[in-house]
Design a protein with these regions (language model features):
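Membrane-topology and secretion signals of cell-surface/extracellular proteins
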Residues: 29, 43, 51-66, 116-135
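Short beta->alpha connector loops
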Residues: 36-37, 79, 101
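A cross-family glycoside hydrolase active-site/sugar-binding cleft signature
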Residues: 46, 57, 74, 97, ...
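Core segments of cupin and vicinal oxygen chelate
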Residues: 2, 9-52
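Vicinal oxygen chelate
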Residues: 1, 4-13, 33, 43-48, 63-135
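N-terminal beta-strand motif that seeds the catalytic metal site of vicinal oxygen chelate
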Residues: 1-19, 71-73, 123-135
Length: 135
């Protein structure tokens, strides 16, 4: 039934600002931009080892009652502290400090300037699966 993660979508009130912030963070431009009446409505980046999709939707299209939080998504990083420090230096606020969750699992999370919770994680299991392609 569930074949795998396809796209992680966040909402933002100011999609142009979100595009600029995430372009700076990720070091790449979005590969896809959809505009409605000349205003960005959706942007999407491809990131990571498998080119996963990270999309941003103008909050005017959010379902009723949509707010920050909810599902926690963690992105694999090699150095959680360095990633956390960079996110904070770019203007994100601390959601959870760097924390060891067990052997081979270190996490941290921030709230981006657009109200989305963004987690980063060092996960040895992910690396083990990646090494063997995990497929």
């Amino acid at each position: 039934m569930l074949r795998g993660l396809t796209t992680v979508n966040f909402f933002a009130d100011d999609l142009s600002a979100a595009q600029a912030w995430y372009t700076e963070l990720l070091g790449v431009e979005p590969y896809f931009v959809r505009e409605i009446e000349g205003v960005p409505a959706y942007i999407e980046f491809r990131i990571g080892d498998y080119q996963h999709e990270l999309g941003f939707i103008d909050r005017r299209f959010a379902p009723p009652g949509q707010s920050a939080g909810g599902t926690m998504t963690y992105w694999a990083v090699d150095d959680v502290q360095a990633a956390f420090d960079r996110l904070v230096s770019l203007g994100a606020t601390v959601h959870q400090e760097v924390r060891e969750q067990g052997p081979g699992f270190v996490t941290a999370s921030v709230v981006d300037p657009f109200g989305n919770v963004l987690g980063v994680m060092y996960n040895q299991h992910y690396l083990d699966m990646l090494g063997g392609s995990g497929e």
